[in-house]
Amino acid sequence: MCPLTLHVTGLMNVSEPNSSFAFVNEFILQGFSCEWTIQIFLFSLFTTIYALTITGNGAIAFVLWCDRRLHTPMYMFLGNFSFLEIWYVSSTVPKMLVNFLSEKKNISFAGCFLQFYFFFSLGTSECLLLTVMAFDQYLAICRPLLYPNIMTGHLYAKLVILCWVCGFLWFLIPIVLISQKPFCGPNIIDHVVCDPGPLFALDCVSAPRIQLFCYTLSSLVIFGNFLFIIGSYTLVLKAVLGMPSSTGRHKAFSTCGSHLAVVSLCYSPLMVMYVSPGLGHSTGMQKIETLFYAMVTPLFNPLIYSLQNKEIKAALRKVLGSSNII
């Protein structure tokens, strides 16, 4: 293992009458402290995962945009979700990859909070979009006759815009408040990304109210959306079990099963990480949990949807021009 070195660089001196303060103007993202050969291995592994994630989600978004037969609300929601995943994984992974090859592993003060903002905003938009997709499934299966009149193109556009706008506004105030707190050193963030837990630990002045505000918002967005999704699929399951046709039941189970698998992948690590102030979590476990929902989940989402959905597989074959590829 690499020895932990206390970095004292990145401090900005601010002089006042009778006093002198040093404030942080950059942070050190410590990441994984390990030998250089292991750093190279992790860089290669995460680069491959990142490339596969971009390719998989990009392929789904592209084929759903190209195939007009799939221009329905259900598939358009999925296309937006894949597009969102590309930006979500790109908010943290490129900097993470650069740090694997860097000795200093620094990130500017503004860069850290921008990463924090986009990572949380895109994650919130993802949670909201999964909730909207559950609502769409509920309408399609439980209210099939009313579905075309309710889920119109106009409503679809409104819901997608609402997910993006609310996602980018949800954590804006707490992130601004945290950024205004004094950080006077040390400036080491013992994490792979700029995360509120390690940032609160570096704050010179304790801010329990801001902490409570931040974790309350996290709990609301995670549990609120999760409970809505579970409630929707409870009603969907009840409706599916009452279907007289076995073919209809199989198709409904296939579609809903894919969505529930993605929901489980997204929400399980989030619930562990952000519904409490992080008590009882070792820094190593926090890093692994973050990597799981920041990299592994976006990687498997396109696989789950494409392998379970015949329409998407057919569209992929059509666009790629070869049935042997998939």
From Swiss-Prot:
GO terms for cellular component: plasma membrane. Keywords: Cell membrane, Disulfide bond, G-protein coupled receptor, Glycoprotein, Membrane, Olfaction, Receptor, Sensory transduction, Transducer, Transmembrane, Transmembrane helix. Residues 66-72, 134-158, 238-259, 309-326 are cytoplasmic. Glycans are attached at residues 13, 18, 106. The chain crosses the membrane at residues 45-65, 73-93, 113-133, 159-179, 217-237, 260-280, 288-308. GO terms for molecular function: G protein-coupled receptor activity; olfactory receptor activity. It is found in: Cell membrane. It is a multi-pass membrane protein. Gene3D superfamilies: Rhodopsin 7-helix transmembrane proteins. CDD domains: 7tmA_OR11G-like. Belongs to the G-protein coupled receptor 1 family. Odorant receptor. This is Olfactory receptor 11H2. The gene is OR11H2.
